[in-house]
């Protein structure tokens, strides 16, 4: 390909020179001089193997670009893998956060329900305690009224008995009462 390029290039460069006026192979013809200079320049380039050096440099540059493209492709794949990993982790963290929120909500609802049950139990206990205190106070009042009635009845009976019985009969009744109390206590 390189060998075909040089003759084709020379052929196309000589075409304008052939169209010039006057003898072509004269040193007065600038087209001929330019053609000779160009051929000499190309010859120098070929002699010093500049086309091979240039193609080698271009090949190295192409290989460098290819390596950079492969590296960029690998980096892109790695970045996509990392992105997918982070997105997956984000979804997992979001799912965990949602689960924590749901659990906290359930716990709060359960705590509220338990607090309501505890409050109702506390109210029931206080109500029962109040009812017990009321019943106790009522029983104490009834007992006090009965005791007072017994005391009044005893006092009235004592007055009636003392007014109707004599001193000897009262002493006999007191002695019998003391014996009865002793018998019941022992």
From Swiss-Prot:
It is a single-pass membrane protein. Belongs to the ATPase B chain family. Pfam families: ATP-synt_B. The chain crosses the membrane at residues 5-25. The lineage of its organism: Bacteria, Pseudomonadati, Pseudomonadota, Alphaproteobacteria, Rhodobacterales. Keywords: ATP synthesis, Cell inner membrane, Cell membrane, CF(0), Hydrogen ion transport, Ion transport, Membrane, Transmembrane, Transmembrane helix, Transport. F-type ATPases have 2 components, F(1) - the catalytic core - and F(0) - the membrane proton channel. F(1) has five subunits: alpha(3), beta(3), gamma(1), delta(1), epsilon(1). F(0) has three main subunits: a(1), b(2) and c(10-14). The alpha and beta chains form an alternating ring which encloses part of the gamma chain. F(1) is attached to F(0) by a central stalk formed by the gamma and epsilon chains, while a peripheral stalk is formed by the delta and b chains. GO terms for molecular function: proton-transporting ATP synthase activity, rotational mechanism; proton-transporting ATPase activity, rotational mechanism. F(1)F(0) ATP synthase produces ATP from ADP in the presence of a proton or sodium gradient. F-type ATPases consist of two structural domains, F(1) containing the extramembraneous catalytic core and F(0) containing the membrane proton channel, linked together by a central stalk and a peripheral stalk. During catalysis, ATP synthesis in the catalytic domain of F(1) is coupled via a rotary mechanism of the central stalk subunits to proton translocation. This is ATP synthase subunit b 3. PANTHER family: ATP SYNTHASE SUBUNIT B, ATP SYNTHASE SUBUNIT B', CHLOROPLASTIC. It is found in: Cell inner membrane. GO terms for cellular component: plasma membrane; proton-transporting ATP synthase complex. NCBIfam families: PRK13455.1 (NF009989). Its main location: membrane.
